[in-house]
Structure formats: C-alpha cells, structure tokens
Amino acid sequence: MRFDLEPPSSVAAAHRTGVLLINLGTPDAPTPRAVRRYLAEFLSDPRVVEIPQVVWQVLLRTLILPLRGRASAKKYAAVWMPEGSPLRVYTERQTEGVRHLLASNAYQVTVDYAMRYGSPNIAQALAQFKRAGVERVLLMPMYPQYSASTTATAFDAAFAALARMRNQPEVRTVRQYADHPAYIHALAEQVRQYWAQHGRPDFAAGDKLVLSFHGVPKRTLDLGDPYHDQCQQTGALLMAALGLSTLECRVTFQSRFGKAEWLQPYTAPTLRELGAAGVRRADVFCPGFTADCLETIEEIGMEVRDEFIAGGGQAFHRIPCLNGAHAWIGALGEIVAENLQGWPVKAAQPEMVN
C-alpha cells in the first residue's frame, strides 16, 4: 500500500486540535448531471443500500440514476438558495458559529466541516487539518441519533483516510447525542420560538405536532441498529420539554425509498390521515435533521403539506430545523467541549504567585 505524502515533520509543529463537523452531503449544483453524480456516490455506499453490489449497481446505473437524476434536480432547484445548497449553507454557518463560540471561550482549536458524500469530503478535510499541523481530531457527526447508514459510514470514510496516512492524528468520535440535555433544550427552544412568532397550535381543539425523523429499512432495527430507539427517545424527551403527550404529538418516519418496509408510521400517510380525521392544523418538526435540506424543505414543506391539505387539513406549518439557532450553536459547543476534555485545547494559564 502506498501512503499519502506527508508534510515535513518538525519539532516545532503546531500540535493543534481539530474539530470536524460531518454532515451527509449535497450535489454541487441543482442540475441532472450534478445530482446523478451525487446520488451515484451516496447510493453506492453499502452502508446505505445493504444488498449485493453486483446486482445493485446494475439497477442503480441503468434504471435509478437515469430516472431520479432529472426529477431530483428539479426538486433541488426548488429549494436552492442564492448562496448554494441549503444543507451546505447552514452547515457553513454552524461551523462558523462553533468556531466563534469556542474561540470566545479561549479554546485554541481548528473547526471545519466535511460532507460524507460530495464536497468538501472527509478525506480532503483531514488532509487540510494535517497541513495545518493538527495532531488531534474530534469527529462530530451532525446526526444526533446513531445509525450505521449515517454515523458509521462517516467514521468509515474518516478511518479509510487515516489508513492512507503515515503519520496519523489522535482521533475521538462522538457517537450520538440523542438524549443530550443541551440538544433537547435547543429543539424545544426552536419549537417555542416558532410558536411565539406564528401562534401555538390549539391542542385542545385537536391540532397536532408531528416529529418526523428520516426513515431507514425496518430490517436494520431487527439487525440491531439503535436508530429507531434513539429517535423515540429524542421524541419522548422533546415532548416532555414542551409539556405535550402522545395525544398531542407523535413520532413518524419519512423519506422511504424502494418497496421494502421501513420504520413506521410513515410521515406522509400520517399527515393525510390526520387531515381526513378532521385535524385542522398540523405542525411538523424534524428533530433528526440539524440543518434544513431537500428532505425538510421540499419533502416536508411541499409534498407532505400537500398530503395534509388533500386529506382535509387546513393549516400546515413546517418548523425550520435547528440551522444556526443560538441555542443550537450553544449545544454544539457544549457537546464538543465535553468531548475535548483531557486534550490541551486552551492556552496555558499563568500560575498564581502568592
């Protein structure tokens, strides 16, 4: 095996610590070509699609990418921001927020972000850390709930990059923070602030709050993936923080792909059923998505909204994701700081002289 070229070794190396925020990824542009390139990388990950690759690649290249590329590009174009992809824009803002927060608290760390699929990728970010003299790395997935198809594959990519390094950094990983008090507080604050601006649902009259998490195939639960249980845990803690019961709030799962059974109940059918049952207003919040993206803005804000209205509902509210909310940046900083303990990340303080 040939290893990557290393920067010159020096006794005067920076000995820095790096914090890498990792999110899923996004196409570089809302065009069929860019979307197909992104989907090819994403859907070729065996952590994401757990069927024999020989069979899957034939289906992916001959059927799925040609059909989904153009259709998905139209959806991306509908949510694209002037600055670029929403996921990238909000992730950059979160990175800058954490960087500023840690610096203001005397942390001497390098903070950056990477995407599991697309760019900037994890290997590129780790290489940049190495060039900056980083010798300790904290991998911080932006997925509060652990899943093999998100958290584990992000770590896979990082470890694959490390395997090509002659001089590896010390590494720590943040596995999950589904029940972290600061994360739950940030979620509750996001919902409360939205209601303060747009009015609180009339739960006494039957209005509902739906907490929609990204779905995964049900077989992953049967095979031991803790994602489902952690989503339910987050949902229960958020309900408690908001003072709601399961009569007023429910947990659902979205973004089903293919014909296999996924975690249920499914979000879109649930909203249609609520509308048909006479629910006047439904608010949908996506606690597992730390930044707004195609699945929240387009799928929830457009497709699921249409399902609710078609079912007979009247008022649909999509509560924005955490994005750059002050409480969320504070929570990120707190979680990062907890996982940096024991590393020399603050300037040495002069000793007190009596």
From Swiss-Prot:
Task of the protein: Catalyzes the ferrous insertion into protoporphyrin IX.
Compartment list: Cytoplasm
EC number: 4.98.1.1
Entry's family note: Belongs to the ferrochelatase family.
Taxonomic lineage: Bacteria, Pseudomonadati, Pseudomonadota, Betaproteobacteria, Burkholderiales
Residues involved in Fe cation binding: H214, E295
The protein's annotated pathway: Porphyrin-containing compound metabolism; protoheme biosynthesis; protoheme from protoporphyrin-IX: step 1/1
UniProt KW keywords: Cytoplasm, Heme biosynthesis, Iron, Lyase, Metal-binding, Porphyrin biosynthesis
Cited HAMAP family: Ferrochelatase
Swiss-Prot/TrEMBL catalytic activity: heme b + 2 H(+) = protoporphyrin IX + Fe(2+)
Coiled-coil zones: none
Protein's recorded name: Ferrochelatase
GO cellular component labels: cytoplasm
Enzyme class per UniProt: lyase
Gene Ontology biological process terms, A to Z: heme biosynthetic process
Organism listed in the record: Burkholderia ambifaria (strain MC40-6)
InterPro entries: Ferrochelatase (IPR001015), Ferrochelatase_AS (IPR019772), Ferrochelatase_C (IPR033644), Ferrochelatase_N (IPR033659)
Gene Ontology molecular function: ferrochelatase activity; metal ion binding
